[in-house]
Amino acid sequence: CFNGKTVKYIPVHYVMSRYPKYGLNYYQCRPAALINNQFMPYPYYAKPVAVKPHAQIPQWQALPDINPPTVPCRRRPHPSFLAIPPXKDQNKTVIPIINTIATXEPTLIPTTEPIVNTVVTTEASSEFITSTPETTTVQVTSPVV
């Protein structure tokens, strides 16, 4: 059963020598305990100094558990962030680039002209009957000088 009032203090060097997978980790996990716990022997924090009336209030300073490493540890990036260039195939044939610009073609302009029927029937008067205009396409080319 876990007793919340007492926290066991295990030296860092014991953990690092006992479990080699923790040997490369310079920052071990610290137990969750209150700083004001009367049963904790202050392994991680310095005790406060007596305060004079006009002096500044000192802050608690974190003490290092082990000697800091001389070389800063470099994290390896996750493989999903690495940019791997695609492999080039030597047997691949080169496809020539085709010019897709179209040549000049004559422009078709639709024109509308009314068509007049001149058919005269016996019952109708001699008026001209105009039907609805029909669209026809006429090819227009520029004159050559």
UniProtKB/Swiss-Prot annotation:
Glycans are attached at residues 91, 107, 112, 118, 125, 141. It holds the Pfam family Casein_kappa. The modification Phosphoserine is found at residues 125, 142. GO terms for cellular component: extracellular space. It is found in: Secreted. Belongs to the kappa-casein family. PANTHER family: KAPPA CASEIN, KAPPA-CASEIN. This is Kappa-casein. The gene is CSN3.
